[in-house]
C-alpha cells in the first residue's frame, strides 16, 4: 500500500493538469473528426453537446462545454498521475495502463451520463469510435506524458 505522506502533490497536480489538457485536446480532435466533421457540423457542436448533457439541456453553450470537458479531463489526468505515482507498475507500462485507464474512464463516464438521464443511442460504429477515442486518444496520451514527466 502506498503512503500519502511522501507524495509530491504539487508535481502530481501539475503533471495531471498537463496530461488532462493533452488528453482533452486529442480526444476532442478525434471525436470531432470522426463524428462531427462527416456531418458538416462545426467543432462547437461537440461542446454544445457536452454543456447540454451536463446541464440536463437547460444550457447549451459551447464555452461552458469546453470548460466542463477540460475540467473533467484534468480531473481524470490528475487521477492517473496519482495512480502512476503510487503504483510503479502503472507508471512503467504506459502502453498497457493508458488504454486500460481510457476504458475505465469511458465506462464510468457512460454511467455518469446514464445517471444524468442522457439516453445513450450508440450504434456499433459509434461505440467503437467512443471506445477508440477514450483508449487511444485519451488514456494513452495521458499515460505516455505521465511516464515521461515522472522520469524528468
Task: List the predicted regions and their residue ranges.
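Membrane-interface interhelical connector segments
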Residues: 37-58
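Hydrophobic alpha-helical transmembrane segments
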Residues: 64-81
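Short, charged juxtamembrane terminal tails flanking transmembrane helices
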Residues: 1-9, 146-152
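Hydrophobic cores of alpha-helical transmembrane segments in multi-pass inner/ER membrane proteins
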Residues: 75, 133-147
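N-terminal signal-anchor transmembrane alpha helix
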Residues: 7-38
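Mid-bilayer segments of alpha-helical transmembrane spans in multi-pass integral membrane proteins
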Residues: 102-112
Amino acid at each position: 500500500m502506498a503512503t500519502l505522506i511522501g507524495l509530491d502533490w504539487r508535481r502530481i497536480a501539475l503533471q495531471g493538469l498537463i496530461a488532462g489538457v493533452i488528453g482533452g485536446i486529442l480526444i476532442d480532435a478525434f471525436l470531432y473528426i470522426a463524428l462531427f466533421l462527416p456531418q458538416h457540423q462545426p467543432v462547437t457542436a461537440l461542446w454544445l453537446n457536452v454543456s447540454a448533457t451536463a446541464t440536463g439541456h437547460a444550457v447549451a453553450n459551447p464555452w461552458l462545454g469546453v470548460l466542463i470537458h477540460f475540467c473533467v479531463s484534468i480531473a481524470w489526468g490528475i487521477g492517473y498521475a496519482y495512480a502512476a505515482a503510487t503504483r510503479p507498475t502503472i507508471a512503467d507500462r504506459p502502453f498497457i495502463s493508458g488504454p486500460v485507464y481510457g476504458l475505465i474512464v469511458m465506462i464510468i463516464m457512460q454511467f455518469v451520463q446514464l445517471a444524468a438521464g442522457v439516453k445513450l443511442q450508440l450504434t456499433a460504429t459509434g461505440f467503437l469510435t467512443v471506445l477508440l477515442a477514450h483508449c487511444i486518444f485519451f488514456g494513452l496520451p495521458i499515460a505516455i506524458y505521465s511516464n515521461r514527466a515522472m522520469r524528468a
